[in-house]
Amino acid sequence: RIPALNPSAEDFRIIWDNAYCVHDLTDDGDKLANIFDILPKYNNEDMVIEVCSTAKITFPGAGVSAIIASDNNIAAIKKRLNVETISYDKMNQQRHVQFFKNADGVRAHMKKHAKILKPKFDMVINHLEKELGGKGIASWFNPKGGYFISLDVMNGCAKRVGELCKEAGVTLTNV
């Protein structure tokens, strides 16, 4: 649906932070369509700018970032960055290249993340199903990747649920 949007403003842009693009917890992670293959069909090739980084893979605040966009958007971004950035952290970029070597190296590293994280996700899902399943008071989904489980509770209950979770030592992210 996004590629088919018809925004009023010619310079309307969607900046998509695809922060969890390689954070699969299972071998059958979600497969997203390549939006950049679809955008031209609707004459919207300049509408989306996708960003991602290794910040949640290697070093928070010191990862290597990437921008995926149309040629027009890349040209505009380069022009702006040329003025804003004196120099990139080339040593940090080199460290990442030497560590990962290529995309397969990133995927192999992320399998290590999944080995650590999946049991924790499974534990949370099991507790949700055991304590709340079938009661009609909350819903959630079992994610195949990322770092979050979305929990939806009954209207008017979110604040109290957050307080109770905090007392139990569980951190919730407000949305």
Give, region by region, the residue ranges found by the protein language model:
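A generic structural signal for well-ordered alpha-helical segments
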Residues: 6-7, 132, 165
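Short, solvent-exposed loop/turn segments at secondary-structure junctions
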Residues: 19-22, 55-58, 71-74, 101, ...
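Conserved glycine-rich beta-strand-loop-beta hairpin in the small C-terminal domain of fold type I
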Residues: 111-125, 137-152, 166
